[in-house]
Amino acid sequence: MTWLSGLYSIFVASAAFCSLGLILVAVILLSRKFLIKVHPCKLKINNDDSLTKTVDSGKTLLSSLLDSGIAIPSPCGGKAACKQCKVRITKNADEPLETDRSTFSKQQLEQGWRLSCQTKVQHDLCLEVEERYFNASSWEGTVVSNENVATFIKELVLSVDPSRPIPFKPGGYLQITVPPYKTNTSDWKQTMDPQYYSDWETFHLFDQVIDNLSLDTDSANKAYSLASYPAELPLIKFNVRIATPPFVDQAPDPTIPWGVCSSYIFSLKPGDKVMISGPYGESFMKEDNRPVIFLIGGAGSSFGRSHILDLLLNKHSDRELTLWYGARSLKENIYQEEYEKLEKEFPNFHYHLVLSQPLQEDLDQGWDKNDPIKTNFLFKAFELRQLSHLPNPEDYLYYVCGPALHNSSILTLLDNYGIERSSIVLDDFGS
């Protein structure tokens, strides 16, 4: 009976510990409810009384404006990384945070410039907001499909109300709002081709529980470049790469969370509803008739596809267009059949695919591992095949989008050839 009494003692102690934990959680929640008082605050915008908004205190300025129908862009999801949610507070600005100090000059800080994603609304404020943000709207989209187009990249296709078309331009982006959610990565197999299972299994990425039920909605918005072009409405498309934790011993680090927005998108199934806002963007096509070279990697495929299909299929442009797309292997290549078809149909479009790590199955299909134009880093292949042979490389436009290392390598290469920054259009968050 001794072992039974010991087991009983352990059970009682465990129950007491769990009960204490629940009591502490309840105390914290009640304290927040009664000690943190929420009060109304007025946001006077552009010195126009008709634009004054009344919001609850405690939220970020970014979230408060979004709730009031003013969609300030925040491509990074409110993490103070993209620096695009700038707002000038002309009256009652609080002391700048470190994120503000690293973003604005001393003079700008004195003028009241702040990052709205970091500024908490605690009292009445007077603001200056660019008028273009008043034109941004929200839509509800319905998931049509959400299939993997590469091992870690999905093509999310949404349908929006055709009576309210989204007035976006190629190169633009929309923000996706993420509600509280919980998902198990094994459920993502429902929208994943089995050819991608093995890599996910190798890195133990299935059967991972991602719990964001207590999500702070202030940080639950992220921007994604559109892969579709306007003529495809009411369908809109995105290419989204999953943000996994770093790998430790071929498994995701359990101490690092999965990407909030990308995990939400990977969990979506046909029929699900998604809230989107926008449109935003500055990486549009320059209408000066210069030839365009697209230097695209990974999920930057969104940015490239939107521009290229609009130029060829919608505008019927005769501009010389060249696409260089970089992927690890043929399994990771996106939109190959579509681009090969366009290349046959349009003599002014040229498509180059570069693989950095072709698989044995790629070599078995005839991929030339020893050809530096086909098997290489994209920026090296591009220089060997095209850039070094251009008599006047400064006469071209260069549209760049991809992972951070891809972007930095391309920008360094172009700078080495004397390409002015004004001839480069960079989408730095599309991947």
From Swiss-Prot:
The record ties this protein, via HAMAP family, to:
NqrF
* Reactions catalysed, as given in the entry: a ubiquinone + n Na(+)(in) + NADH + H(+) = a ubiquinol + n Na(+)(out) + NAD(+)
Q: Which residues are listed as membrane-spanning? A: 10-30
Identify the domain of life.
Answer: Bacteria
The Enzyme Commission number assigned here is 7.2.1.1
Q: What is this protein called?
A: Na(+)-translocating NADH-quinone reductase subunit F
Cofactor (UniProt)? [2Fe-2S] cluster; FAD
